[in-house]
Amino acid sequence: MKNELIKIKSILPLQKAPLVHCITNDITLETVANTILYLGGKPIMSSDTREFSSLFQSTDALLLNMGRLNESHEQSLSQASSLADMTKKPTVVDLVGYGITNERTKLGMAMARNHPTVIKGNTSEIRRFVGLPSLAKGIDGASSDQHDQALKDLILSLKQITTEYADTVFVATGKKDVIVQNDKHLILSNGVDELDKFVGTGDMVGAIITTLLAVGEDPWVASQFAISYLNVAAEKALSLTNGMENFRREVLNQIDLLGRNQQWATKIKYSNF
């Protein structure tokens, strides 16, 4: 843990500006792009399959986000996922809305089988992915899925599928955030309730992880960094603002500012049940 914290402190500033290919939903597209820019990366937001052959030769990592799914978006995600598997491109799959429709479930499972580096979602989405029940409606997580016993069940279920998803890092976000890889797990507990009140915070976590994968960071460390960085940024933003729109803007502002001082990482809260 101590060595990982030292590594997390040293990640920013990035030593190079990686090119990050994002196939994401158009609702949060600008937020995702700005998150990558503020970290020091360069986003390219392309879902046109005609460009993939060229882009896969020049980009450093790939973000696949299932939000606002339609037939064209599904085709882009599916093709990019297969290409990423063939080319061993570092990839984050964000299972937005997994399990709420057959289309999302089939697509999410297909992308998961293509050996992504990281699979993420909120606790309810990841519960459905491993076959556990969830009371969540739509793309928002259910509070009942975030109780201690529910998280214990989720961690156990994720560890049980590691033979099928060897080395893949699973990230489940919520009031407590869970990271699982093979037989190890971690629970983080920073953050504020206001993060659930504006669209795109989960997408931002995916963007941060992908940016760090693009500069060669270890996916386990990158996932810890991404969750903690956003949550600590939100804690700082809440202390400086009143009103949700001001809070939303300040979170993005803190994505830019927070990493200029390595001491932000001393605020990371590791948790048990």
UniProtKB/Swiss-Prot annotation:
EC number, as in UniProt: 2.7.1.50
Gene3D superfamilies the record matches: 3.40.1190.20
InterPro entries for this protein: Hyethyz_kinase, Ribokinase-like
Needed cofactors: Mg(2+)
GO molecular function, one term: ATP binding
CDD domains (alphabetical): THZ_kinase
Transmembrane parts of this sequence: none
Keywords assigned: ATP-binding, Kinase, Magnesium, Metal-binding, Nucleotide-binding, Thiamine biosynthesis, Transferase
Matching Pfam families: HK (PF02110)
Record carries keyword Magnesium: yes
Pathways involved: Cofactor biosynthesis; thiamine diphosphate biosynthesis; 4-methyl-5-(2-phosphoethyl)-thiazole from 5-(2-hydroxyethyl)-4-methylthiazole: step 1/1
Binding site for substrate: M45, G200
Catalytic activity: 5-(2-hydroxyethyl)-4-methylthiazole + ATP = 4-methyl-5-(2-phosphooxyethyl)-thiazole + ADP + H(+)
Gene Ontology biological process: thiamine biosynthetic process; thiamine diphosphate biosynthetic process
Sequence positions that bind ATP: K120, T173
HAMAP family the UniProt entry points to: Thz_kinase (MF_00228)
Family the UniProt entry places it in: Belongs to the Thz kinase family.
Function: Catalyzes the phosphorylation of the hydroxyl group of 4-methyl-5-beta-hydroxyethylthiazole (THZ).
The protein's name in its UniProt record: Hydroxyethylthiazole kinase 2
Organism of provenance: Leuconostoc mesenteroides subsp. mesenteroides (strain ATCC 8293 / DSM 20343 / BCRC 11652 / CCM 1803 / JCM 6124 / NCDO 523 / NBRC 100496 / NCIMB 8023 / NCTC 12954 / NRRL B-1118 / 37Y)
Encoding gene, per UniProt annotation: thiM2
